[in-house]
Amino acid sequence: MKFDLTAACTLSATLLVSSGTVFATTANTANKSLTTIESHTPISYGNNSSSLWEKFNNNVALTWDAPNNELYLPVITWHNRHTYDKEKTDRYNERPWGFGYGKYRYDEDNDWHSLYAMAFMDSHNRLEPIVGYGFQKMWIPGDLEGFRMGIGFTLSVTARHDYYYVPIPLPLPLFSIEYDRLSFQGTYIPGTYNNGNVLFAWLRWQW
């Protein structure tokens, strides 16, 4: 167990550092692209892959340079009881103790962008890191001042003990209910019977 925890922490730190390097490189490249674009006629993003990739890079760069910060506190990992045998859910961990940090911004449409890193205890009570980029389309319900609701996606990379901590790409949906600086945010991980089909959620505080 001591070896597993040491290895997990080492690999988690490596994943977080390398991801930060990737984000920084992407942000730097995108900033150069933005400088070039500003000296020419503004481009319009169509449906072609190069424009989408350039738009993604620009969003990463703007988020990386944003002065705003977020903290994440994982609160629940719920295994869908309709897709699991009871003997499995009885022994699975559903309290994902952990912590995370991110940088965020709201764009001109009030949509949320974030670059984040989080580590928590998975269903088998093993350390699991995750890093990625998140986007949510935000909606303000009626005249409820301070409240926001959002739905979107995250493009992330995780690593798990049962897969020997090999980095795994993990695109997932995102949702949130927010009031002022506090949010309840989560994702649903799809899967098959006795695998996946997990609701994972956390509290998010911005400053």
UniProtKB/Swiss-Prot annotation:
Subcellular location: Cell outer membrane
Site (Role in the phospholipid gating) residue list: Y193
Top EC class, one word: transferase
Active site: H79, D122, S123
Broad class of the protein's primary localization: membrane
GO biological process: lipid A biosynthetic process
Keyword Transmembrane annotated: no
Gene3D superfamilies, per the entry: 2.40.160.20
InterPro entries: LipidA_acyl_PagP, OMP/PagP_b-brl
Catalyzed chemical reaction(s): a lipid A + a 1,2-diacyl-sn-glycero-3-phosphocholine = a hepta-acyl lipid A + a 2-acyl-sn-glycero-3-phosphocholine; a lipid IVA + a 1,2-diacyl-sn-glycero-3-phosphocholine = a lipid IVB + a 2-acyl-sn-glycero-3-phosphocholine; a lipid IIA + a 1,2-diacyl-sn-glycero-3-phosphocholine = a lipid IIB + a 2-acyl-sn-glycero-3-phosphocholine
Site (Role in lipopolysaccharide recognition): K88
The protein's Enzyme Commission number: 2.3.1.251
Induction note: Induced during magnesium-deficient conditions.
GO molecular function annotations of the record: O-palmitoyltransferase activity
Keywords annotated in UniProt: Acyltransferase, Cell outer membrane, Membrane, Signal, Transferase
Segment forming the signal sequence: 1-24
Annotated GO CC locations: cell outer membrane
Family designation: Belongs to the lipid A palmitoyltransferase family.
Subunit record text: Homodimer.
Listed HAMAP family: PagP_transferase (MF_00837)
NCBIfam families linked: PRK11045.1
Record function comment: Transfers a fatty acid residue from the sn-1 position of a phospholipid to the N-linked hydroxyfatty acid chain on the proximal unit of lipid A or its precursors.
This protein's name: Lipid A acyltransferase PagP
Native species: Photorhabdus laumondii subsp. laumondii (strain DSM 15139 / CIP 105565 / TT01)
